[in-house]
């Protein structure tokens, strides 16, 4: 009966974790998958296995590549964490069969759950932790000290080579276990951490690994350019604390009856409180919306981006996604002011050299038709990815090199993607464009983007963001996105002088055969008292009538200036007039 109750508990934990992660972390797993590029080739896998911690790296890469599939990321993570909890509980039971400290068994698992939400954490750390637990469970099954010590020695060496820094945690755990169990000649086990320390020192000495923290600490399972938050150490601390407490309480009088029930309930309550507080502190809910928009961009679900942007926001990243979605739908200049706007940075955020912003800017530049800038940002995002590249940015590099006719480079990236699980079919479909200008030029996407290529080279934004856009539009008049971005840029900056020049120069041409809604509203501002000027640019009667009502209400409420913005927003918050006057 006890056996089945334990299985039932683990099933309940798995189901709970899966449902929870499915609801609150679905888009996080999609982003984690984008942070690595795992190739299913012998050369790639052997290269990883030759590194300290290589097997954990390969196993985690194999698992994470499936995170692109709906629900799979939540399922794999829930299954792995539940398995770790069950394994550690079995270890504690092996140390003290009468142990009722289920709290201690699940604290390391909760700590590992919290660190999963860190975008810069590598899943390898969780896999390596599981490998360490498995080794500990097997070694503790050996009753005699000397055989157990020999097995521990081999396990330490194997863990160092296959799992990385967890080998030191394993070695220290065995020393602690032997000491607290008062094993005769327990101090022989001190050789275990000594050997790990010597191996680690040699790795640093001969530049196999760059820093000691990557040899002995869980920092190795984090993006190497950053210093991890303290939460990454919690699982190690909780694990060792649980081991110490269980060893010290071994052979103590076991609680029974109501005391045992009360102990179990109190432990579950404590675990629940820790879970709730940990999710609040480390759940990364502030960045979750950004991860969601990144996924919608990747899958071209522009309407879902716009739905998520209906609520007012001051976050320039959200606005950048929003305006890109409008541009992709061809309605940026018509509907930009139906959504929240806060200046020109909502069109193009500043580059901070991070992989996330680089990927976003690559998408924005590609939307504008700026192939050179899109390629540069894709390259920056790709080389800055956590593990060997970013699949989507590698796809972008395939596209941009095909557009440029740099077929050998494109072929190299295609070959990489052909070695992956999810992207191989897409990559194979791109081979028809290699060394085939006609196929590229007749393709709706690649051909149109090739027509955006400028005849002369220019440094990006050397003459200004708007100048680059106008050059692109002049090069390819069918590229409406670039021209609309330029016009909306002037409107968001309230640069009416340049906007006037833009309209008067290009109205009636292929670039601007008619004015979009926001441009018509802005033309009225250019010459508020000259209706003939409006007619010159084809401002519709409905917009003229709406402006008349707008002006009348502004004049009626001018004596109540504090309340006027709120009053006008109700009826005219979707107009450029409101933005120009009140923002």
Task: Annotate each language-model stretch with its function.
Residues 277-450, 458, 474-495:
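Soluble catalytic regions of membrane-associated enzymes that act on cell-envelope
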Residues 18-75:
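Membrane-interface coil-to-helix junctions
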Residues 186-253:
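Membrane-embedded alpha-helical segments of integral membrane proteins
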Residues 257-281:
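Internal/C-terminal transmembrane anchor helices
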Residues 78-95, 134-138:
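Transmembrane-helix motifs of polytopic, lipid-linked glycan transferases
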Residues 1-17, 259-268:
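Start-transfer (signal-anchor) and selected internal transmembrane alpha helices
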Residues 31-35, 49-53, 73, 77, ...:
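Membrane-interface micro-motifs in multi-pass membrane enzymes
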Residues 102-105, 141-157, 185-194:
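Short hydrophobic alpha-helices at membrane interfaces in multi-pass membrane enzymes
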């Amino acid at each position: 009966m006890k056996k089945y109750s334990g299985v039932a508990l683990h099933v309940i934990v798995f189901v709970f974790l899966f449902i929870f992660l499915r609801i609150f972390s679905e888009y996080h797993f999609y982003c984690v998958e984008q942070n690595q590029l795992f190739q299913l080739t012998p050369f790639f896998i052997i290269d990883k296995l030759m590194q300290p911690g290589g097997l954990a790296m390969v196993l985690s890469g194999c698992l994470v590549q499936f995170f692109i599939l709906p629900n799979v990321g939540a399922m794999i993570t829930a299954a792995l964490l539940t398995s770790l909890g069950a394994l550690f509980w079995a270890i504690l039971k092996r140390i003290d069969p009468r142990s009722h400290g289920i709290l201690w068994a699940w604290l390391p698992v909760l700590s590992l759950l919290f660190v999963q939400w860190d975008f810069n954490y590598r899943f390898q750390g969780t896999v390596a932790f599981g490998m360490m637990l498995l080794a500990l469970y097997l070694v503790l099954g050996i009753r005699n000290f000397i055989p157990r010590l020999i097995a521990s020695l081999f396990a330490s060496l194997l863990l160092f080579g296959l799992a990385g820094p967890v080998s030191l945690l394993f070695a220290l755990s065995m020393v602690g276990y032997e000491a607290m169990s008062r094993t005769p000649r327990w101090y022989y086990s001190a050789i275990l951490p000594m050997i790990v320390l010597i191996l680690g020192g040699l790795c640093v000495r001969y530049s196999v690994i760059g820093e000691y923290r990557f040899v002995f600490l869980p920092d190795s399972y984090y993006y190497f350019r950053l210093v991890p938050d303290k939460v990454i150490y919690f699982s190690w601390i909780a694990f060792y604390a649980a081991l110490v407490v269980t060893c010290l309480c071994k052979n103590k009088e076991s609680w029974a009856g109501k005391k045992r029930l009360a102990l179990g309930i109190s432990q579950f309550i404590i675990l629940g409180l820790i879970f709730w507080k940990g999710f609040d502190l480390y759940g990364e809910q502030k960045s979750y919306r950004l991860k969601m928009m990144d996924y919608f961009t990747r899958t071209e679900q522009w309407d879902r981006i716009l739905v998520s942007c209906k609520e007012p926001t001051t976050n320039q990243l959200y606005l950048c996604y929003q305006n890109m979605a409008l541009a992709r739908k061809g309605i940026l200049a018509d509907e930009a002011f139906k959504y929240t706007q806060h200046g020109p940075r909502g069109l193009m955020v500043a580059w901070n050299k991070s992989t996330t912003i680089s990927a976003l800017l690559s998408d924005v530049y590609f939307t504008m038709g700026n192939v050179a800038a899109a390629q540069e940002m894709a390259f920056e995002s790709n080389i800055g990815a956590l593990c060997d590249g970013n699949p989507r940015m590698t796809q972008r590099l395939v596209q941009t090199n095909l557009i440029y006719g740099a077929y050998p480079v494109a072929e190299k990236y295609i070959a990489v993607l052909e070695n992956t699980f999810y992207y191989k079919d897409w990559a194979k479909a791109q081979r028809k464009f290699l060394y085939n200008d006609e196929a590229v030029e007749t393709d709706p996407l690649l051909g149109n983007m090739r027509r955006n290529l400028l005849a002369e080279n220019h440094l990006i934004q050397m003459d200004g963001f708007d100048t680059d856009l106008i050059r692109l539009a002049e090069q390819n008049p069918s590229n409406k996105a670039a021209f609309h971005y330029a016009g909306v840029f002037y409107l968001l900056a309230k640069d009416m002088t340049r906007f006037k020049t833009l309209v008067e120069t290009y109205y009636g041409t292929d670039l601007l055969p008619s004015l979009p809604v926001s441009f018509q509203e802005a033309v009225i501002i250019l010459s508020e008292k000259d209706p003939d000027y409006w007619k010159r640019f084809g401002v519709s009667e409905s917009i003229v009538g709406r402006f008349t009502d707008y002006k009348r209400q502004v004049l009626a409420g001018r004596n109540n200036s504090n309340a006027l913005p709120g009053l006008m927003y109700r009826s005219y918050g979707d107009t450029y007039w409101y933005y120009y006057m009140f923002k």
